[in-house]
Amino acid sequence: MRPVTDIQRTDRPFEVVTDMVPAGDQPAAIEELARRIQGGAADTVLLGATGTGKTATVAWLIERLQRPTLVIQPNKTLAAQFANELREMMPHNAVEYFVSYYDYYQPEAYVPQTDTYIEKDSSINEEVERLRHSATTALLTRRDTVVVASVSCIYGLGTPQEYVDRMATVEVGMEIDRDELLRRLVEMQYTRNDVAFTRGTFRVRGDTVEIIPVYDELAVRIEMFGDEIERLMTLHPITGEVLGESDRVYIFPASHYVAGPERMRKAIAGIQAELEERLAELEAAGKLLEAQRLRMRTTYDVEMLEQMGTCAGVENYSRHFDGRAPGSPPNTLLDYFPEDFLVVIDESHVTVPQIGGMYEGDAARKRTLVEHGFRLPSAMDNRPLTWDEFRERTGQTLYLSATPGPYELERVGGDVVEQVIRPTGLVDPEVIVKPTEGQIDDLVHEIRIRAERDERVLVTTLTKKMAEDLTDYLTDLGIRVRYLHSEIDTLRRVELLRELRVGVFDVLVGINLLREGLDLPEVSLVAILDADKEGFLRSERSLIQTIGRAARHVSGQVHMYADTVTDAMAAAIEETNRRRAKQLAYNAEHGIDPKPLRKKIADILDSLAREDADTAELLARSRGEKRGTPTPRSGALSGPDRVAEQAKNLPREELAALVEQLTEQMHQAAADLQFELAARLRDEIKELKRELRGMEEAGIG
């Protein structure tokens, strides 16, 4: 089933590098999980309460099992958070990030009722695309790989076999005609550009060919003597500094959808045959408009494929390129893993239904396009996997959740591994049920107590209107409050949470955003209004997740305002009290005094604002003397320690342009939640500006 490739994967061991040692429930959980998985259990569930260190447990488990691992997260933000934490703990292994590369995506659709065709429109994030290619490259070249992915991993990707077949292997001493090498690069979808040297392009200078692989930040230089490869070097694309030499380099294609000439011919023949068949069906049914539309669109796409090797919406023809039978599942990221890989599904109560629901939503939209002649029926096979297909392609699976869903519990017969004792000794919050009469006055009283103690409060309501009204009312009373809702963009959301932590305001009001993955140690009170209104926002799982937001504070409390105790409330309170009793008993037995969680508050957003003002002033001064600015070369410097040294070789005008470009990159990195990259760029900009000021004082041009 899985294609066998000739490429050799390097076999470095998984290794956790950290000052931490397993504590609380972690040692027992790691031991039991390893025992079950090594014993061949197909499914295992870790019931890990909020703040018990599930990420660290996963890292130590991977080190113990020594198996490539796929971690699936419910959204991009949690995937980035998990990947960053794993990278810190496993610095010598390949921890990759694989999520949808669209910043904005409007899928192709047709609305028959109004005869409206909506063309596909999207904006691709190049850095995320690089990380996707980096993930597939790592999977095919090394065994010590962990990929943290969103549900994007069950969507179609080119076949790993074709990806490897199109790969170019270059070795020192190898004989190859230079023009043949350039032809190979073009077939792999690389573009020649001798002026703007960016990712996915190559340039030629005499017998030297330089490429920036689409999955890398560094360039590869191939030096030839005649038809023989003399040297292979890795270099920095901006400074040209040589960072290393190799005897062999693999260059993977610039696209996951790449096909050789023979496969392209077969695919085009298949598309044309399907077109004739479908046109006959439409004409027989009297659908002449649909037939004409399909003929025009498909003929144009075929011409583009013949001339350019690709076309808009090429993924809709993936079945023909892969040589798959109608109705067969697509190739996905799962096919790039070795046979023995482990799957970890985090926040499984959300992620499992999400994986299961992707297929139907996609099929409903495509069905309309096919019926009305916008696409061939084979477009239906460019789709996500169904749940059953996903299960067939995955082996052993570990489900992580503070509130495992019915599917996971059924798979293990309710026999879960528990991790409810926190290494810090913190216990689950005390839950208090209060009547709804006078609830707002009581809430205001509780908020004032917390504000005096410099603690924070989360308030969760049922409707947007109620959240807005409550925010206005609290503001009128002089309480520092903000409202978090779905229309706030991602970066502003991160900023709001940070402002809550540092104390810019004391209360955050929300609806359904105060649940999975929010890490707020300063919050000592979570108030749940209308806790007795049954529905998905007040189900047992939702309540336990919301209660968990107060579990990172020594004196955390949850106040539920309700007139009756529903079954969901009773179950959530009972489970919280069970965990709390177990945690208190453990602390008493081991003499542990709960320690407040001190988690560093990221200063990235704050420093971006300061950096902006400083950069604007410096650039204005620097530009005042000369008109016109050269376009700086793309990329980022390799590290702040070498920046000042490298900058000495740049003229002042070019240095100012580089500062401006890196500032843009810093903002983009922050917007993409790549905070480590943004912080690194911030440090580089500081070094460059120091050099620029020095040149300014010395009067150097």
Swiss-Prot record:
Protein task: The UvrABC repair system catalyzes the recognition and processing of DNA lesions. A damage recognition complex composed of 2 UvrA and 2 UvrB subunits scans DNA for abnormalities. Upon binding of the UvrA(2)B(2) complex to a putative damaged site, the DNA wraps around one UvrB monomer. DNA wrap is dependent on ATP binding by UvrB and probably causes local melting of the DNA helix, facilitating insertion of UvrB beta-hairpin between the DNA strands. Then UvrB probes one DNA strand for the presence of a lesion.
An MF annotation (GO) of this entry: excinuclease ABC activity
Domain UVR: 656-691
PANTHER family registered for this protein in UniProt: UVRABC SYSTEM PROTEIN B
Natural source organism: Thermobifida fusca (strain YX)
Family: Belongs to the UvrB family.
Subunit structure and binding partners: Forms a heterotetramer with UvrA during the search for lesions. Interacts with UvrC in an incision complex.
Binding of ATP, residues: G48, A49, T50, G51, T52, G53, K54, T55
GO cellular component, one term: cytoplasm
Pfam families membership: Helicase_C (PF00271), ResIII (PF04851), UVR (PF02151), UvrB (PF12344), UvrB_inter (PF17757)
Domain characteristics, as noted in the entry: The beta-hairpin motif is involved in DNA binding.
Protein name according to UniProt: UvrABC system protein B
Subcellular localization(s) per the UniProt record: Cytoplasm
Superkingdom of origin: Bacteria
